[in-house]
Regions:
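Long, aromatic- and glycine/proline-rich binding clefts that accommodate carbohydrate-like moieties
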Residues: 75, 310, 314-317, 366-418, ...
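A structural signal for short loop-to-beta-strand junctions that line the ligand-binding cleft
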Residues: 96, 104, 132-171, 212-213, ...
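Extracytoplasmic/periplasmic solute-binding protein
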Residues: 32-34, 149-157, 162, 172, ...
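Glycine-centered hinge/linker elements that transmit conformational signals in sensory
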Residues: 193-197, 239-275, 319
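Extracytoplasmic "Venus flytrap"/periplasmic binding protein-like
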Residues: 66-138, 147, 151-154, 172-175, ...
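Extracytoplasmic/periplasmic substrate-recognition and gating elements
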Residues: 68, 72-73, 78, 174, ...
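Short, low-complexity disordered leader/linker segments with a strong preference
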Residues: 1-50, 447-463
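Hinge/lid segment of periplasmic solute-binding proteins
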Residues: 41, 110-163, 190-191, 227, ...
Length: 463
């Protein structure tokens, strides 16, 4: 059953936060979880900020550059980094909170972090943002939970929009028209499927497919949502905080994906992905050169460049339209930072998150990693290959969708993934399987005292 506020489920979170003690939880604030005007940070007294991140070690260079940049402005602030995996984040962060040893700043698991918003673990940054004249909604590409129930709980880092990577070399060898040939990149879902049919082949004639049309996260409800949105439907009712994957528009879209995956084999299966990544020693299927189209986020751009090198020519296309009146609706996401309310160094912790979100931190991100959330620094990233990388920035100028997030989003996703795997394996009828998954996913939904998406419609249409 969907619950607006499940005290049984979040009371242990609230109790854990309360156990940290009123003095620690308030720490220069007017009340728990809310920052006051704040007094100036002493630039002479040494301060250590404990920073929890799930970024892998290959991104450590960016973090070190951030630390150097922060030191130039705040020489007394030292940042100690703890790196964990995203898979262990929820458990480890909650244990730290419950034991009274939480970090000061966290790189969010944005699909779970709202549970800590609503239980008072995170600092409401509204007064600090106002003090520093930061306008998040005007100046940043947002991912959906920086602002939650009228409060500011996070500062942006990256703008993680989705588009379609494509293998130009594969299309050329097959004698197929490049969608960018006319300089417009205007294409449809029908175009993508037609091209996918022509390149899906058993190239070595050993009886097994070894080249595919599309790599798509078909076991992830938000990635499938891009197709449903484009067709005019949705997988969630944001206004009423519930999943609707059992509704006609979703059922029709899932049936089509079933046909492309199971009947026509245009979409490479997860088992086939594992096999070709092992054979080619690559970290995703597109980089093997055996897939024509990969629906993925901008964060893949630099890793694609490193792993593909000059093996084949590739570029980026916008998510394909359904028709001339129904544009493609891609997914956008992002990974913001939050400050822990119990931090004894709140101002220093905030300054770390603020530096990352500020012009210098965002330029470092653009030069070393991905598309920054700060709009004024996005052009720095757009100088990187491929030719049409700007497609990722342009996502925010057209209709787009976001993840449907609640306190236990990850749990709902696990239910969905298991359900569609059974459906696509022929173990469960599609409609019955999605209806049961929808029921179970909705049982996991929990949120706080407000309707967090009140007034929001998907797709989001930029003003």
């Amino acid at each position: 059953m969907t619950t607006k506020t499940s005290r049984r489920r979040i009371i242990w979170l609230g109790a854990a936060a309360a156990s940290l003690g009123a003095a620690g939880a308030v720490a220069a604030c007017g009340s728990q979880g809310q920052a006051g005007a704040g007094k100036a940070l002493d630039t002479k007294q040494a301060v250590t900020v404990r920073y929890l991140t799930w970024w892998p070690l290959d991104r450590a260079g960016t973090i070190e550059e951030w630390k150097t940049g922060l030191k130039a402005e705040w020489p007394n602030i030292n940042v100690e980094t703890e790196v964990i995996t995203l898979g262990e984040y929820n458990t480890k962060f909650q244990v730290a909170v419950a034991s009274g040893t939480p970090p000061d700043v966290v790189l969010q698991n944005s699909h779970a972090q709202t549970r800590w918003y609503d239980s008072g673990v995170h600092l409401d940054l509204s007064s600090l943002v106002a003090r520093d004249k930061i306008n998040l909604q005007r100046d940043y590409a947002l991912m959906g939970t920086e602002l939650w129930c009228g409060k500011t709980y996070a500062l942006p880092m990256d703008a993680d929009s989705n588009a379609v990577f494509y293998n130009r070399t594969m299309l050329q060898k097959a004698g197929l028209r490049d969608p960018w040939a006319d300089g417009k990149g205007d294409w449809s879902l029908d175009d993508m499927i037609e091209l996918a049919r022509k390149v899906t082949q058993d190239t070595d004639r050993d009886g097994k497919l070894d080249q595919w049309g599309i790599a798509w996260s078909y076991t992830h409800v938000s990635h499938v949502a891009q197709f449903v949105w484009t067709k005019g439907g949705d997988v969630a009712d944001f206004q009423n905080m519930r999943y609707i994957i059992d509704q006609p528009a979703s059922l029709e879209a899932h049936q089509q994906i079933y046909n492309w995956l199971v009947k026509e084999h245009l979409i490479i299966s997860n088992a086939e992905i594992s096999e070709i990544q092992r054979l080619y020693n690559k970290s995703n299927p597109f980089r093997t050169g055996r897939v024509a189209f990969h629906i993925r986020a901008v964060a893949d751009v630099r890793q694609n460049t490193r792993e593909i090198s000059d093996a084949f020519e590739w570029d980026v296309l916008p998510f394909p339209k359904f028709s001339n009146t129904r544009p493609g609706i891609p997914l956008v996401s992002g990974n913001p930072h939050s400050v822990v309310a119990a931090s004894k160094v709140q101002e220093a912790a905030y300054q770390w998150a603020r530096f990352i979100a500020g012009p210098k931190g965002q330029e470092i991100l653009a030069l070393t990693q991905s598309l920054p959330a700060l709009k004024s620094k996005q052009e720095v990233f757009l100088k990187t290959p491929p030719n049409h990388v700007k497609v990722f920035q342009e996502v925010y100028n057209k209709p787009y969708g976001i993840h449907f997030r609640h306190h236990y989003t990850n749990d709902s996703w696990d239910i969905y993934g298991a359900a569609v795997n059974r459906i696509y394996a022929g173990e469960t009828p599609l409609q019955a399987g999605l209806q049961e998954a929808n029921r179970q996913m909705n049982e996991k939904i929990q949120y706080g005292q407000c309707m967090p998406y009140k007034g929001l419609t998907i797709p989001i249409r930029p003003k």
